[in-house]
Amino acid sequence: MAISAKDVMELRKQTDCGMMECKKALTEADGNFEKAIEILRERGLATAAKKASRVAAEGMVYADYCPACKVGVVIEVNAETDFVAKNDKFVDFVKEATKVIMKQNPADVEALMACKTEAGETVDEALKNLILVIKENIKVRRFTRYEGVCSAYVHGGGTHGILVNFETTNDIDAKDEFVAYGKDIAMQVAAANPSYVDEASVPAEVVAKEKEIMLAQMAGDPKNANKPDAVKQKMIEGKIKKFFKENCLVDQEFVKDGDLSVAQYTAKVAKDLGGDIKIVKFTRFQKGEGLEKRADDFAAEVASMVK
C-alpha cells in the first residue's frame, strides 16, 4: 500500500526515528502504526514503551474528591477551541456534571446525560443550552468515579486530571499530612505517567511482549552472538526490572525525592501517621488524548444537537 508523507511524519514524531526508517516500518506493517512502532522497537530504533497519542481536541479535564462522602471523580469535556475552557459557564457545567456523577453514580456518559442536575434539568439539556450560548460543539467524553479514600489533582489549568484511590487504616486519611501525601502521589502520576500501580497489575501478555521485543533487539546485535544463554537471561531480567521501574507507579523514582521510590515514600508516610497506606488504582486523563481536530462542519453538528 502507498504510505503518505503525513503518516511518515506522524510516526517520526511518535518515535524520533529517521524518515526512511519510519517509511520502511510503515511499509512492512501495511500502514499499521502500532505494528510499525513494534518493528522499530525490535530493531532497537525506538525505545518508547507506551503508545504515543495525537492530542488535538480542546476543552478541559477536571477532578474532584468529596472527603465527607469518600467519592472521587475525574472527567473530560471537549470543545472546539482552547478559550472555551476559560469560559465561566463552561467551567460551571463541568463542575455540575462532576457533582452529578458523584451523587448519582451513572454507569457511563449516556446514563449521565439522562441524570438530573440540581437545577432540575437533565445534563443533556444543560449541555444543549450551553452549546446555544457558547456556539461551539461540546461533548462529555469520559469520566471515572472511585469510591473510598481518594486524591484528586488538576494540572495545567485542566490539561491533565488525576484521580488516585487508596486503602488506609486508623483514619489517617483525615490528617493533613495524608492529604499532602495524596497530592504528591497524584502529581507523580501526572508527571511520570505510569501505566500500572505495581508489577502484579501488569498483564502477563504485556510482560511476554516486552520480553519478545527485548530478545529481538538482542538477536539483532552482533555483540550478543557469543554470549551464553544464562548471560542473556540475566540481561532480559535486568531490562524487565527497568521496564517495571519506568511503568509501575510504586516502583518509580519519587519525583520530589530521587533517593526514594514511591513505595518507600508511601511506607515512610504510613509509619509517620501510624497506619497503613495502599495505592489501589489511579486514572490519568490528558485533555484530547487520542483525538484529532476534524475538518467536519461543526456548525451543522451543533445545529443538529440543539434541535
Segments the model singles out, each with a brief description of its role:
Residues 2-307:
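N-terminal assembly/interaction segments in proteins that build large macromolecular machines
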